[in-house]
Amino acid sequence: MNYEDDNVESGQAGKSDAEYKADIANREKEVTKALNAGKPQDALNVALADPPIYTKTGAIKDQNATIVLNLLGSFKDKDVETSVETLNDDQLDILMKYVYRGLATGENSPIFFKWHECVLKKGGAGTIIRVISEKKTV
């Protein structure tokens, strides 16, 4: 077993931390590019794709969460529901994990409550149940 295997949750053939770091750097560039092009929905899709749920390295999860939470905070209130409506169930679950993470910071709570309301409206209580019972965190 090598060092990289030690940082992957057991039972999962996840990526190495180096691969996650490269993915996160690319994700940040793509999110910024989409936002600069006036395409927040594209930025959201990129931000929610392939989160680092299989790593045990908190710094990697924190770095990715910063990208997602900053993106969520940048949405205009009126655009949140429209954006949520385009997401599939897996994306809704991932988004809800980030919403709870954002609420846990105690910062920018009104926008995270708006996201929560819209995700709950579309995904129903099942989204909340899956998120709170899931062991893999973002």
From Swiss-Prot:
Disulfide bridge positions per record: none
Stored InterPro entries: ARPC5 (IPR006789), ARPC5_sf (IPR036743)
GO biological process assignments: actin filament polymerization; actin nucleation; Arp2/3 complex-mediated actin nucleation; exocytosis; phagocytosis; regulation of actin filament polymerization
Taxonomy, superkingdom: Eukaryota
GO terms under cellular component: Arp2/3 protein complex; cell cortex; cytoplasm; cytosol; pseudopodium
Gene Ontology molecular functions: actin filament binding
Annotated stretches, region: Disordered: 1-21
A Pfam family per the record: P16-Arc
UniProt keywords, alphabetically: Actin-binding, Cell projection, Cytoplasm, Cytoskeleton
Compartments reported by the entry: Cytoplasm, Cytoskeleton; Cytoplasm, Cytosol; Cytoplasm, Cell cortex; Cell projection, Pseudopodium
Quaternary data: Component of the Arp2/3 complex composed of arpB/Arp2, arpC/Arp3, arcA/p41-arc, arcB/p34-arc, arcC/p21-arc, arcD/p20-arc and arcE/p16-arc. Interacts with carmil (via the region between the LRR domain and COOH-terminal proline-rich domain); carmil is required for Arp2/3-dependent actin nucleation. Arp2/3 complex, MyoB, MyoC, and the alpha and beta subunits of capping protein all form a larger complex with carmil.
Free-text function comment from the UniProt entry: Functions as a component of the Arp2/3 complex which is involved in regulation of actin polymerization and together with an activating nucleation-promoting factor (NPF) mediates the formation of branched actin networks. Seems to contact the pointed end of the daughter actin filament. The Arp2/3 complex is involved in organizing the actin system in cell motility and chemotaxis, in phagocytosis and macropinocytosis, at late steps of endosome processing, and in mitosis.
Family of this protein: Belongs to the ARPC5 family.
Name of the molecule in the record: Actin-related protein 2/3 complex subunit 5
Highest classification ranks of the organism: Eukaryota, Amoebozoa, Evosea, Eumycetozoa, Dictyostelia
